[in-house]
Structures are given as structure tokens and as C-alpha cells.
């Protein structure tokens, strides 16, 4: 192979830098596990694992983009290389086979990837499309059979709430009584009622899609919406940061 040009040398230098970053991240995680007593917090471990994952992803993308160059390169020592004093490093550079442990990891990863590709139990694209077409209507029908937000389900109310064993020592009130009291309190206020979706069904005819039933909310549902709106709102960015790093979001 001819001598390397500046772009190829730059590619090798970028590979070295990425591998050094990964090595330092792994050493930092191992050191924190071996030296910390008690062990580091979950958020700290999650943060270090995220850094290692990003380093691995960066190396994988870099090696894939420069696969042709890296597969054509051949390492050999020059006349000025200190082979006697740097013999271990030279052996690693001239090694043609993977380390036995690394080779075992690679073989297990390849077997897992092959089994995932051969998995015939997964749904096809047409089956997934049919599932997503069926799910909204069926979920809405099931939701309308439930009494969301109450102390008792519809099945428990049908068989009598006095026969329900809740395991609680406090007295649960019937929702009908609460709704009648709230209705009497809201009489004469003259507030404008917002419309809400109470049903969904598949549109008949040649046109595809769903159609929704619109109705005014009941006093009980309005009260539930006010209770939900009173809760603290967490920004989506804080939620995603908590999912990836484990750092609890700050309520605003």
C-alpha cells in the first residue's frame, strides 16, 4: 500500500481519539465501582453508562464510515520502532486474531442478531397496520364501560358498593351523591361549557378514518379536569432527561 495521505492519517487519529475516550470512560466507571463505599448513586451510574453508550455509538459510526480504509491498512514496525522495549504494544498491533474473551463476545452478539432476524413471531407490517386501525375504537369502547376516577368500578356498583372490600379504613362515599352536590353548587353560575370527545367509531362508507362523538362534559368530568390542571406541570425536556440520566426533574 502506498504511503498515507493527510486525510487517511486524520482518520486514524480520529479513531485513536475515540478509542482513548472510550477507554477513559470505562476506567472511570470501574474505578468508581471499586473505590466508592457505598456504591455510587443510581443517577451517577446511569450518567456514566450514557457516556459509554455515546462513545460506543461514535466509534461504531466512525468505523462503519471508514471501513474500506481501515480494512486495507496493514500495521508493521518501522526500523526506528523500539521493538525490545515496547514488545507488548507491538504484539497487540500485530495481532491478527481477537482476544479470546472478545471473540466470545462477538460470537454471542452475532448469534443474538441472527436469532432476532429469524424471529418469525413478530407481527408483519400489514398486521401492525391492522392492529393500529383496530386499537383506537376498541380502546374507546372499553374506556366507556369504565368509571374512571371514581372509588368504585361499574361492576362493583352493579353488585352493590356495600359488598365491596377495599382494604381501607376510611369511609368511601358514593360518587352519585358527590355529583348531585356539585351540580347543586354549580347552578346559576352560567359558565360556558366546553365540548369533549365521548365516543369514537370507524367512519362508514368509502372514506377511511374515524369519527368522534362530541358532547358537553358532565360536572363530575369538569371537576376532574380542574383537579388535573391543578397538578404541577413537568416540561417534556425534564422528563426525557430523567429517562436517560436518572436525574429527578425540578417541578416548576
Curated annotation (Swiss-Prot):
Pfam families: Med8. One of its GO terms (molecular function) is transcription coregulator activity. GO terms for cellular component: core mediator complex; mediator complex. Keywords: Activator, Coiled coil, Nucleus, Transcription, Transcription regulation. GO terms for biological process: regulation of transcription by RNA polymerase II. It is found in: Nucleus. Residues 170-252 are annotated as: Disordered. Residues 6-30 form a coiled coil. InterPro entries: Mediatior_Med8_fun/met. Residues 173-196 have a biased composition (Acidic residues). Component of the Mediator complex. Belongs to the Mediator complex subunit 8 family. Component of the Mediator complex, a coactivator involved in the regulated transcription of nearly all RNA polymerase II-dependent genes. Mediator functions as a bridge to convey information from gene-specific regulatory proteins to the basal RNA polymerase II transcription machinery. Mediator is recruited to promoters by direct interactions with regulatory proteins and serves as a scaffold for the assembly of a functional preinitiation complex with RNA polymerase II and the general transcription factors. This is Mediator of RNA polymerase II transcription subunit 8. It comes from Neosartorya fischeri (strain ATCC 1020 / DSM 3700 / CBS 544.65 / FGSC A1164 / JCM 1740 / NRRL 181 / WB 181). The lineage of its organism: Eukaryota, Fungi, Dikarya, Ascomycota, Pezizomycotina.
Amino acid at each position: 500500500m502506498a504511503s498515507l495521505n493527510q486525510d487517511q492519517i486524520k482518520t486514524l487519529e480520529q479513531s485513536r481519539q475515540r478509542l482513548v475516550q472510550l477507554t477513559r470512560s470505562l476506567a472511570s466507571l470501574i474505578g468508581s465501582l471499586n473505590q466508592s463505599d457505598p456504591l455510587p448513586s443510581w443517577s451517577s451510574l446511569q450518567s456514566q453508562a450514557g457516556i459509554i453508550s455515546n462513545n460506543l455509538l461514535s466509534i461504531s459510526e466512525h468505523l462503519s464510515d471508514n471501513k474500506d480504509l481501515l480494512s486495507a491498512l496493514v500495521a508493521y514496525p518501522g526500523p526506528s520502532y523500539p521493538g525490545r522495549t515496547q514488545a507488548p504494544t507491538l504484539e497487540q498491533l500485530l495481532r491478527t486474531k481477537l482476544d479470546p474473551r472478545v471473540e466470545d463476545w462477538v460470537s454471542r452478539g452475532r448469534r443474538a442478531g441472527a436469532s432476532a432476524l429469524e424471529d418469525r413471531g413478530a407481527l408483519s407490517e400489514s398486521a401492525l397496520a391492522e392492529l393500529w386501525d383496530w386499537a383506537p375504537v376498541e380502546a374507546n369502547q372499553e374506556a366507556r364501560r369504565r368509571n374512571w376516577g371514581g372509588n368504585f368500578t361499574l361492576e362493583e356498583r352493579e353488585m352493590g358498593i356495600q359488598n365491596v372490600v377495599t382494604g381501607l379504613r376510611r369511609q368511601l362515599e358514593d360518587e352519585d351523591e358527590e355529583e348531585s352536590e356539585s351540580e347543586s353548587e354549580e347552578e346559576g353560575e352560567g359558565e360556558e361549557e366546553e365540548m369533549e370527545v365521548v365516543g369514537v367509531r370507524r367512519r362508514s362508507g368509502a372514506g377511511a378514518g374515524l369519527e368522534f362523538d362530541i358532547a358537553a362534559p358532565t360536572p363530575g368530568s369538569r371537576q376532574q379536569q380542574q383537579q388535573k390542571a391543578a397538578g404541577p406541570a413537568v416540561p417534556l425536556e425534564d422528563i426525557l432527561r430523567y429517562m436517560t440520566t436518572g436525574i429527578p426533574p425540578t417541578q416548576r
